[in-house]
Amino acid sequence: MAVRFLFEALQKAIDEEMEREKRVVLIGEDIGHYGGSYKVTQGLYGKYGKHRVIDTPIAEYSFVGAAVGAAATGLIPVVEGMNMAFILLAYSQISNNMGMLCATSGGHFQVPMVLRGPGGIGKQLGAEHSQRLESYFQSVPGLQIVTCSTPYNAKGLLKSAIRSKNPILFIEHVLLYNLKGEVPDNDYLLPLEKAELVREGSDITVLTYSRQRYNVIQAVKVLVEEGYDPEVIDLISLKPFDMETIGKSIQKTHKVLIVEECMMTGGISNVLQSLIIDNFFDALDAAPLILSSPNVPTPYTGPLEEATVVQTIDIIESIEYGITGKPPKPRTAKK
């Protein structure tokens, strides 16, 4: 068992899968000689060469399309988008080809590929590089969406994604690459469609994913000291949702709060809230609550940037309100 940064866990996953299966190839901007913007592919060009680690121009539409073709004809591409905001330039390829080709070809072509890279709000990266776009891709037929949040699940999930026969959007958070954690040295896989029960509780079900997992954990620590008992679930799979795990928790707590970094309009939480109401209405004591980011571009300056992201104090107050139904008590904590 080694302690690794999250980016190192991703690197290890890719390395192991490239060594195991010669059809796995890497495609993307600056992934070869440079080793990737966040060093996830560092060292792989030297080990596997230019035919398996392919540097591309800054042309997302073209290299995602090339990867779809490669996947349909027998390879297993792992594509790095330097920033998820600019993967939008390849949206037509993702929607019309990556997601739907298997169905539109009557099953003649499969598209076993992974499109991965950083998303979320970083530290003063500016509006264009601070977008949360997972909900943009949720409506693409045939596309799975997976998020990682720890070095342990990053490695296990990415290995599973590479071995899957489905096209997968694998979202990493820019602020989690330097997160440290224990990662087994052995070959292990984690299920792509399974949520993680982070903390058992009985008062309310808190659903979250990616970076907000850690803000939720900090909020729960404060509330536990005050006598509250929230249950915390890391969704991991954003499409499809693990409704079995979610439902089991709701049957116990009867209250729900969804915490996300997406914007409040059209976010992941809107779809999840609807599914919860449709499937578990009779188990709910109140409507599921949503805590999302405001509908504004992310400012560059630090204090304003922070104001556009859900903070720990927001989560504390929302959980308390969800449990008691009363306005939260005044607190001085800001994070």
UniProtKB/Swiss-Prot annotation:
GO MF, any single term: pyruvate dehydrogenase (acetyl-transferring) activity
EC number: 1.2.4.1
Top-level EC class: oxidoreductase
Superkingdom of origin: Eukaryota
Primary location: plastid
Catalytic activity field: N(6)-[(R)-lipoyl]-L-lysyl-[protein] + pyruvate + H(+) = N(6)-[(R)-S(8)-acetyldihydrolipoyl]-L-lysyl-[protein] + CO2
Subunit structure: Heterodimer of an alpha and a beta chain.
PANTHER family: PYRUVATE DEHYDROGENASE E1 COMPONENT BETA SUBUNIT, PYRUVATE DEHYDROGENASE E1 COMPONENT SUBUNIT BETA
UniProt protein name: Pyruvate dehydrogenase E1 component subunit beta
Taxonomic lineage from the root: Eukaryota, Viridiplantae, Streptophyta, Chlorokybophyceae, Chlorokybales
Underlying gene: pdhB
